[in-house]
């Protein structure tokens, strides 16, 4: 998997970083950015992942924007890849350095393996169900804090209802630091290694969260529903 992500990064993603023309940046579904690099990277990832498991299904963020029915693959009795070719597209399109490739392998909604790859740093974060979380093949365990004033977290409020957004504002007055990278892959990694204690998220698209959820779980963290 490291070779696949490295090659896609070197051949497709990084050549476009800070080098996108205006016609290579567009919007899908009205407000979500998509770049030529997202589209081409997803095609290449799909081709390579289906070579690994030829009978598996594939759900990619860009493919979903054209065909929402592909989410039904999660209900089938088969393996399924879930991919976000560039998590943090807004950062990528604006020349900011926090973006990642996110991949997960599931079977009937059970997450089996996941990978989060940081192209600029050439760092692979991965997880195997019941076996642990790893950074460049070194096993890691998260650490927390019992002191609320030392807590650092992320809150994404873009898609919350206005009333719930107001309730979340209280966290900014309690914790040491609350911010967002605008790249959930980076935030999951930070939680896994203990640099961040929590993330409160509002948009739960599978490609944004399935890879990171397994990484955090296997590092010793947890995920819960607030509402």
Name the predicted role of every residue range.
Residues 60-62, 137, 182:
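Short loop/edge segments at beta-strand edges and connector loops
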Residues 1-86:
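N-terminal subdomain of lithium-sensitive/metallo-dependent phosphomonoesterases centered on the IMPase/IPPase/PAP
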Residues 135-141:
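A structural micro-motif at secondary-structure boundaries
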Residues 13, 38, 49, 89, ...:
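Residue-level signal for inorganic ion chemistry
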Residues 143-227:
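An extended, acidic
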Residues 39, 62, 85-88, 119, ...:
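Generic detector of well-ordered alpha-helical packing
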Residues 71-134:
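DPxDG-like acidic metal-binding loop motif
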């Amino acid at each position: 998997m490291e070779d696949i992500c490295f090659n896609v990064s070197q051949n497709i993603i990084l050549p476009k970083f800070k080098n996108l023309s205006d016609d290579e940046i567009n919007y899908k579904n009205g407000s979500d950015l998509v770049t030529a690099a997202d589209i081409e990277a997803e095609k290449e990832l799909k081709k390579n992942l289906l070579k690994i498991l030829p009978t598996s299904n594939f759900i990619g963020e860009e493919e979903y924007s054209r065909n929402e029915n592909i989410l039904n693959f999660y209900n089938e009795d088969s393996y399924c890849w879930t991919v976000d070719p560039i998590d943090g597209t807004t950062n990528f399109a604006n020349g900011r350095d926090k973006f990642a490739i996110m991949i997960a392998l599931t079977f009937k909604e059970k997450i089996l393996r996941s990978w989060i790859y940081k192209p600029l740093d050439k760092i692979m974060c991965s997880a195997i169900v019941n076996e642990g979380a790893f950074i460049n093949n070194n096993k890691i365990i998260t650490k927390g804090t019992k002191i609320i004033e030392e807590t650092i977290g992320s809150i994404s409020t873009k898609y919350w209802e206005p009333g719930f957004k107001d309730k979340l504002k209280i966290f900014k007055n309690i914790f040491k630091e609350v911010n967002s990278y605008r790249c959930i892959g980076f935030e999951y990694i930070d939680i896994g290694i203990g640099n961040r204690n929590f993330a409160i998220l509002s948009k739960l698209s599978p490609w944004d969260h399935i890879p990171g959820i397994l990484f955090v779980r296997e590092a010793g963290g947890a995920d819960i529903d607030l509402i």
